[in-house]
């Protein structure tokens, strides 16, 4: 979609591509297509993380986290990969009935959340899929605690996305 707006980018007002209301879809990218492509591109990363996930969830149950938060969950492929890895290859996977895994997919983009939710439902994976901003972890922690009674610190926090579509914000409360 962005290349269809090349005249605005080169000769007009490039800010037009970002001027949308909160309820409108982005006009510079087809986010559903972007989410689909990102999910496939991350498969190599998934393989590397698998060993890490297995080692964490093979520990004695009292040492294991309550679950995992995937920040920038995209299409939900990473949550699906993590769940299947834990279920099939770890001590925790044998204990899911008594020690359920709290899975959270968080994303800044509503289209990504919709795709994640649909993919996880289609794969019969229970997870909370919520809006979250990596630039505001305090709000994410507050939302998790208030809405689900879970502390952010009790989850393994993982992300697979590139920092994109983010406007620079100056740090606040610098010491």
Predicted regions and their residues:
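Phosphate-coordination loops involved in phosphoryl transfer and adenosine-cofactor binding
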Residues: 65, 100, 154
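The conserved SAM/SAH-binding core of class I Rossmann-like methyltransferase domains
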Residues: 104-106
């Amino acid at each position: 979609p962005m290349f269809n707006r090349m005249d605005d980018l080169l000769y007009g007002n490039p800010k037009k591509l970002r001027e949308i209301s909160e309820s409108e879809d982005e006009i510079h990218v087809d986010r559903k297509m972007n989410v689909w492509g990102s999910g496939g591109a991350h498969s190599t990363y998934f393989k590397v993380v698998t060993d890490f996930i297995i080692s964490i969830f093979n520990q004695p149950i009292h040492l294991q986290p309550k679950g995992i938060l995937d920040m920038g969950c995209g299409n939900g492929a990473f949550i699906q990969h993590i769940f299947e890895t834990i279920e099939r290859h770890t001590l925790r996977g044998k204990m899911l009935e008594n020690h359920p895994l709290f899975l959270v997919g968080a994303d800044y983009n509503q289209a990504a959340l919709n795709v994640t939710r649909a993919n996880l439902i289609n794969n019969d994976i229970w997870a909370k899929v919520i809006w979250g901003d990596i630039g505001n972890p305090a709000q994410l922690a507050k939302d998790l605690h208030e809405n689900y009674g879970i502390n952010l610190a009790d989850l393994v926090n993982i992300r697979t996305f590139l920092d994109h579509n983010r406007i620079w914000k100056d740090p606040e409360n610098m010491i």
